[in-house]
């Protein structure tokens, strides 16, 4: 059995044994430890409060040397989530130097990260977006220039997530 699958099984068991507020996780298919379905609960005191946003975590076979990819399958309007649902945060970027110079190496993926640290970073991103490098330029622009419209669009996403 691959080291990565053993590590993922341990991380899943740890999360089930000691759940963390704000999210839950499980396997999409019991026979595939590399594909997880997660539910991110909109953090209190944010525009996303009350939302139940589903996402997929796709782990590479060389995890934890390389980060997983995270994609929301629930619609979510946020500057750091592109229109296809892909999450763009530093710790999900491959380790090493950033060729564009936006991120320091220690901000990027490190093998010490776990599923829990990833999901806590996503919750932090929902609370405090990074406007320096938006994945959804339209959402970032709307939040800056027409906050009322931005709030309305996020509220629609929250409502839809409650109906899924």
Swiss-Prot record:
GO terms for biological process: proteasome-mediated ubiquitin-dependent protein catabolic process; protein polyubiquitination. GO terms for molecular function: ATP binding; ubiquitin conjugating enzyme activity. Pfam families: UQ_con (PF00179). Residues 3-163 form the UBC core domain. The active site is at 88 (glycyl thioester intermediate). InterPro entries: Ub_conjugating_enzyme, UBQ-conjugat_E2_core, UBQ-conjugating_AS, UBQ-conjugating_enzyme/RWD. Keywords: ATP-binding, Nucleotide-binding, Transferase, Ubl conjugation pathway. It is an enzyme of class 2 (transferase). It catalyses: S-ubiquitinyl-[E1 ubiquitin-activating enzyme]-L-cysteine + [E2 ubiquitin-conjugating enzyme]-L-cysteine = [E1 ubiquitin-activating enzyme]-L-cysteine + S-ubiquitinyl-[E2 ubiquitin-conjugating enzyme]-L-cysteine. Its EC number is 2.3.2.23. The keyword Nucleotide-binding applies. The keyword Cell division does not apply. Pathway: Protein modification; protein ubiquitination. Transmembrane segments: none annotated. Belongs to the ubiquitin-conjugating enzyme family. Catalyzes the covalent attachment of ubiquitin to other proteins. This is Probable ubiquitin-conjugating enzyme E2 7. It comes from Caenorhabditis elegans. The gene is ubc-7.
């Amino acid at each position: 059995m691959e080291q990565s699958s053993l590590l993922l099984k341990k991380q899943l068991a740890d999360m089930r044994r000691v759940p963390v507020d704000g999210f839950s996780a499980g396997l999409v298919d019991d026979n595939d430890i590399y594909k997880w379905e997660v539910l991110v609960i909109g953090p209190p005191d944010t525009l996303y409060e009350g939302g139940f946003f589903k996402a997929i975590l796709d782990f590479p076979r060389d995890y934890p040397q390389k980060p997983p990819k995270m994609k929301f399958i629930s619609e979510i309007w946020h500057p750091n989530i592109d229109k296809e649902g892909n999450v763009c945060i530093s710790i999900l970027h491959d380790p090493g130097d950033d060729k564009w110079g936006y991120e320091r190496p220690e901000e990027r993926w490190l093998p010490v990260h776990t599923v829990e640290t990833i999901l806590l970073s996503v919750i932090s991103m929902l609370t405090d977006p990074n406007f320096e490098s938006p994945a959804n330029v339209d959402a970032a622009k709307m939040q800056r220039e027409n906050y009322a419209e931005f709030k309305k669009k996020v509220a629609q996403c929250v409502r839809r997530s409650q109906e899924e």
